[in-house]
């Protein structure tokens, strides 16, 4: 059994924001299997799919980004899933838009959802798939305003290209593991 977690914020005002691209990614995965989200274990919404014989639990923490670790730990404990079998999908301001990056482990890199998951698990050793949201090299005056802002029309076009590839990468992880997914998907998408 695998666990895929899409990070985001739960209120409707955050729909379509850069910070909620993790939610968009897992919604795309669930929809491709005809699965719907319902109340999950702890403070999350969950969908269940079977991919090539592998059971996959997909969750969207309803705790707000900065407390995502609570929902991850609750799902891991309930389903008895180990760290090697989880994949966290989130936005990454350090990656250019049009890029996804899978890693087997690592720091939070400034992403507060990942930071809380690391604190909650007591380890950086879990897979993550980061979706680049940086649109240019100009310095930002407010990181929070940018990540909580809605995608521009041009950015939406890029995200529509990325989401199916993100879905494929996540599903590759569930069957073949993080190393295989990294080898196949760590490259610019656009």
Swiss-Prot record:
Pfam families the record matches: Pept_tRNA_hydro
Site (described: Discriminates between blocked and unblocked aminoacyl-tRNA): 9
Catalytic reaction(s) noted: an N-acyl-L-alpha-aminoacyl-tRNA + H2O = an N-acyl-L-amino acid + a tRNA + H(+)
Keywords from the named record: Cytoplasm, Hydrolase, RNA-binding, tRNA-binding
Transmembrane segments: none
UniProt-listed GO biological process terms: protein quality control for misfolded or incompletely synthesized proteins; rescue of stalled ribosome
Binding residues annotated for tRNA, in chain numbering: 14, 64, 66, 112
Subcellular location: Cytoplasm
Lineage top rank: taxon: Bacteria
Residues annotated as the enzyme's active site: 19
The EC number(s) this enzyme carries: 3.1.1.29
Site residues (Stabilizes the basic form of H active site to accept a proton), renumbered to this chain: 91
The keyword tRNA-binding appears for this protein: yes
Chief localisation class: cytoplasm
Subunit structure: Monomer.
Described function: Hydrolyzes ribosome-free peptidyl-tRNAs (with 1 or more amino acids incorporated), which drop off the ribosome during protein synthesis, or as a result of ribosome stalling. Catalyzes the release of premature peptidyl moieties from peptidyl-tRNA molecules trapped in stalled 50S ribosomal subunits, and thus maintains levels of free tRNAs and 50S ribosomes.
Family, as annotated: Belongs to the PTH family.
Protein name: Peptidyl-tRNA hydrolase
Organism: Pelodictyon phaeoclathratiforme (strain DSM 5477 / BU-1)
């Amino acid at each position: 059994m695998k666990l895929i977690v899409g990070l985001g914020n739960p209120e409707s005002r955050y729909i379509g924001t850069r910070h909620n691209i993790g939610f968009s990614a897992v919604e795309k995965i669930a929809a491709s299997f005809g699965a719907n989200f319902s109340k999950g274990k702890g403070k999350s919404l969950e969908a269940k799919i079977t991919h090539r014989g592998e059971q996959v639990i997909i969750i969207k923490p309803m705790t707000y980004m900065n407390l995502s670790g609570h929902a991850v730990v609750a799902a891991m404990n309930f389903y008895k899933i180990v760290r090697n079998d989880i994949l966290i999908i989130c936005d990454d301001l350090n990656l250019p838009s049009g890029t996804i990056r899978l890693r087997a482990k690592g720091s939070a890199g400034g992403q507060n959802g990942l930071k809380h998951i690391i604190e909650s698990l007591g380890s950086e050793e879990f897979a993550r798939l980061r979706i680049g949201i940086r649109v240019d090299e100009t310095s930002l005056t407010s990181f929070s305003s940018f990540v909580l802002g809605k995608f521009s029309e041009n950015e939406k076009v890029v995200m529509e290209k990325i989401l199916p590839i993100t879905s494929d990468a996540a599903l590759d992880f569930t069957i073949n593991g993080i190393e295989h997914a990294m080898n196949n998907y760590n490259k610019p998408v656009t």
